[in-house]
Amino acid sequence: MVTETPLEKPLDIGEIPLPAMEKRATEVAILLKTLAHPARLMLACTLAQGEFSVGELEAKLDIRQPTLSQQLGVLREAGIVDTRREAKQIFYRLAEDKAARLIEALYAIFCAPEENL
């Protein structure tokens, strides 16, 4: 039998001022919209594990280089990933802690191996 851990009770909506809630909702909607593509979601999940070169990402995810570059560009433009150049190689890593935490939560919910009890 799988026992689910109860979620922490979120703050009462009345505790967050409406303008702050609207701002947060907009930020989250933009982040979710950016991640709402299978290739970008796979990239973000992989980058949650650490920094990878374009070649490593291409091999690991079996995404062709033109598609990979396009999707990494979208993530970079949204501020979700940062880059580092070393000679001719470009390395990518998650830039935003909130994105990393969201990816970790999505992984735990949808991708983690189920326990056999």
UniProtKB/Swiss-Prot annotation:
Keywords: DNA-binding, Repressor, Transcription, Transcription regulation. Disruption phenotype: Cells show altered biofilm formation; on glass surfaces and on tobacco root surfaces, it exhibits a greater biofilm mass than the wild-type. Residues 20-114 form the HTH arsR-type domain. Residues 54-77 bind DNA. It holds the Pfam family HTH_5. SUPFAM superfamilies: Winged helix' DNA-binding domain. GO terms for molecular function: DNA binding; DNA-binding transcription factor activity. Represses an operon that comprises at least itself and blh. Binds to a palindromic AT-rich sequence spanning the -10 region of the blh promoter and blocks transcription of the operon. This is Biofilm growth-associated repressor. It comes from Agrobacterium fabrum (strain C58 / ATCC 33970). The lineage of its organism: Bacteria, Pseudomonadati, Pseudomonadota, Alphaproteobacteria, Hyphomicrobiales.
